[in-house]
C-alpha cells in the first residue's frame, strides 16, 4: 500500500509519466516539479535530489536497485540521465555545473561518479559501457566489459568530450573540447585529442577570467 501511495503522489504532481514497479523512493520531490520526462520501470530504486532539475533533463531508470544522487547547488541545464540493468549508481557532486550531457550507466553494478565543483560543458558524453559486446573469435569471451567512471573534484570537461568506461580523472584536471578520454587522467593536468593525451602538467583552473 505504501508503494502505491508513493507512486500516486508522484503521478498526481505530474513528475512521472511512467512509474511501474514498487519500492521506488524519490527524495526531493519539490525540486523535480518542473520535470517533464521521468520514467522508472523497476523496483527498489532510490532517487535523492537536492538541487532543482529542469524540464530539459530527462531521467530514465530501467531495472532494479539503482541509485541517483544529485547533491546541493548543482546546475544541470539539458541532457539525459540513463540507467539500465540493475544496481547502478550515478552521483553528481555539490556545486557542479552541466550545460548539456548524456550520463549513462547501462550495465549492472557500475558507478558513474562526478565530484564537487566540476564544470561540464555542452554535448558531453559519459558512460560506463560500450552498450554492445566485442567478442574474441578464438575464445568466445567478451573483451569489453563495463567499468566504473570516476571524475574527481574541480574538473573541467570541454565541449563535445567523451569520457569512456574505466576512466578516472584526477582533481583539478582539464579535458580539452572534442577529446575522447580512454585512459586515466592525472590530477592538475590538461589532456586533449583522440584519444586524449597529456599536453600539460602542474596546472589548475578557475571559472573566472583572472
Where are these regions (language model features)?
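Conserved catalytic segment of ABC-fold P-loop ATPases
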Residues: 170-173, 186-188
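Flexible, glycine/small-residue-enriched loop-and-beta-strand segment within the central core
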Residues: 48-167, 202-203
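Conserved beta-strand->loop/alpha-helix structural units within folded catalytic cores of enzymes
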Residues: 100, 177-178
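Short, hydrophobic/aromatic alpha-helical segments in well-folded domains
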Residues: 159, 176-177
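Acidic, glycine-centered active-site loop in nucleotide-sugar glycosyltransferases
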Residues: 187, 192-195
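Terminal amphipathic alpha-helical/low-complexity segments used for targeting or macromolecular assembly
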Residues: 1-56, 64-65, 117, 123-124, ...
Amino acid at each position: 500500500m505504501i508503494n502505491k501511495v508513493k507512486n500516486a503522489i508522484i503521478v498526481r504532481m505530474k513528475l512521472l509519466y511512467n512509474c511501474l514497479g514498487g519500492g521506488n523512493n524519490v527524495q526531493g520531490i519539490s525540486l523535480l516539479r518542473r520535470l517533464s520526462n521521468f520514467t522508472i520501470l523497476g523496483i527498489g530504486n532510490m532517487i535523492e535530489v537536492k538541487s532543482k532539475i529542469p524540464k530539459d533533463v530527462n531521467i530514465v531508470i530501467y531495472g532494479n536497485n539503482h541509485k541517483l544522487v544529485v547533491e546541493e547547488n548543482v546546475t544541470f541545464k539539458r541532457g539525459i540521465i540513463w540507467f539500465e540493468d540493475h544496481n547502478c549508481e550515478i552521483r553528481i557532486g555539490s556545486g557542479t555545473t552541466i550545460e548539456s550531457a548524456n550520463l549513462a550507466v547501462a550495465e549492472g553494478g557500475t558507478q558513474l561518479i562526478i565530484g564537487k565543483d566540476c564544470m561540464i560543458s555542452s554535448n558531453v558524453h559519459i558512460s560506463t559501457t560500450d552498450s554492445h559486446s566485442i567478442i574474441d573469435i578464438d575464445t568466445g569471451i567478451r573483451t569489453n566489459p563495463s567499468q566504473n567512471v570516476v571524475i574527481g573534484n574541480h574538473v573541467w570537461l570541454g565541449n563535445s568530450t567523451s569520457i569512456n568506461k574505466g576512466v578516472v580523472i584526477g582533481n583539478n584536471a582539464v579535458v580539452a573540447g572534442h577529446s575522447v578520454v580512454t585512459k586515466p587522467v592525472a590530477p592538475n593536468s590538461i589532456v586533449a585529442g583522440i584519444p586524449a593525451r597529456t599536453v600539460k602538467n602542474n596546472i589548475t583552473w578557475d571559472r573566472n577570467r583572472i
